[in-house]
From Swiss-Prot:
Main enzyme class: transferase
HAMAP family for this protein: GcvT
Cited function: The glycine cleavage system catalyzes the degradation of glycine.
Annotated signal sequence range: none
GO molecular function: aminomethyltransferase activity; transaminase activity
Name under which the protein is recorded: Aminomethyltransferase
Organism for this UniProt entry: Shewanella amazonensis (strain ATCC BAA-1098 / SB2B)
EC number, as in UniProt: 2.1.2.10
Recorded family membership: Belongs to the GcvT family.
Pfam families listed in its UniProt record: GCV_T, GCV_T_C
Length: 364
């Protein structure tokens, strides 16, 4: 039996088309994926992300433990509520998961991990926590709703209490605050402003309905995927996994190499990979007809006339731009153009940094 989030009946009320997503029964769309996509880029949309896993890490060694566990350095977090994104790596430098960590105090952190990797993540975190004075607590009683888009914050403000609006006023990106019963964070997976709201399950339906009444469009996994790809954000299991190191997944910026004596898990392997040189993740743009898709081969010839091959990790038609975009893992020598093999012929594509749309506008 597939798991259902606490909002399952609300999805059915809005005529959602439900699909299996890593063992969860989730909405693919509510009628039109394209309309849902545009709602987030132009107005406000919301997603049920209650399948995500919230884990609280507490104890005297919480800071030391997370500095060992994660490739990014949570010691950078000194203001309560500040968050950072990064990878949890294995000893070979492969990405076990990408996650967000919120700093609540030196002895209390909140980590949000992907649903598809929940059991693996919890087992790994528990194993690595041995020898540290920490308590790892999964919070399955919490649901999560992401409200995203240029009007998302204004529409959410009509639903929040006075206390909650005061708490989020002027909150910068990548912060989270507990305000009443809600943990409200300025994070997201769309390239737009907005909130990810962690809410007790008992209150989730009422919050969802209040946002609906405020004119927020419910959006499914289909729009979530085209939005995150336009924003150049990785999907775990597709753009990276345990066989891929963060340098080859456009996550190099999330590795805190300094201080040099912080021995995070995977550091030694990653230093060797860095010294040798790694593949990289790039963006591809194809303005002619057709759609770039996952697993299509990518070819280019380097300055010495040698042909190299890579592969598309994620590809789609971009509703915002009106043509196809993709992310591809390729050897580092790639130039400004490449060729993609589709329908037994090669088509020329532009190669750019993997970010296509930010705040509703073309980003390249």
């Amino acid at each position: 039996m597939a798991n259902k989030t606490v909002l399952f009946s609300k999805h059915l009320e809005s005529n959602a088309k439900m699909v299996d997503f890593h063992g969860w029964n989730m909405p693919l769309n509510y009628g039109s994926q394209i309309e849902e996509h545009h709602a987030v880029r132009r107005d406000a949309g919301m997603f049920d992300v209650s399948h995500m896993t919230v884990v609280d890490v507490e104890g005297a060694d919480a800071r030391a433990f997370l500095r060992k566990l994660l490739a990014n350095d949570i010691a950078k977090l000194t203001v309560p509520g500040k968050a950072l994104y990064g990878g949890m790596l294995n000893h070979d430098g492969g990405v076990i998961d990408d996650l967000i960590t919120y700093y609540l105090s030196d002895t209390q952190y909140r980590v949000v991990v992907n649903s598809a990797t929940r059991e693996k993540d919890l087992a790994w975190i528990g194993e690595q926590a041995k020898g540290f004075d920490v308590t790892i607590t999964e919070r399955p009683e919490l649901a999560m709703i992401a409200v995203q888009g240029p009007n998302a914050k204004a529409k959410a403000a009509t639903v929040f209490t006075a206390e909650q609006n005061a708490a989020v006023e002027g909150m910068k990106p990548f912060f989270g605050k507990q305000a009443g019963s809600l943990f409200i964070a300025t994070t997201g997976y769309t390239g737009e402003a907005g909130y990810e709201i962690i809410v007790p399950e008992a209150e989730a339906e009422a919050l969802w309905q209040a946002l609906l009444d405020a004119g927020v469009q419910p959006c499914g996994l289909g729009a979530r995927d085209t939005l995150r790809l336009e924003a150049g954000m990785n999907l775990y299991g597709q753009d990276m996994d345990e066989s891929v190191n963060p340098l080859a997944a456009n996550m190099g910026w999330t590795i805190a190499w300094e201080p040099a004596d912080r021995d995070f898990i995977g550091r030694e392997a990653l230093e060797a990979i860095k010294a040798k040189g790694s593949d990289k993740l790039v963006g591809l743009v194809m303005e002619e007809k057709g759609v770039l898709r996952h697993d299509m081969p990518v070819f280019f010839t380097d300055a010495n006339g040698v042909e190299h091959q890579g592969v598309i990790t994620s590809g789609t038609f971009s509703p915002t731009l009106g043509y196809s975009i993709a992310m591809a893992r390729v050897p580092g020598a790639i130039g400004e153009t490449a060729e993609v093999e589709m329908r037994k012929k090669r088509v020329t594509v532009r190669v750019i940094a993997p970010s296509f749309v930010r705040n509703g506008k073309q980003a390249f």
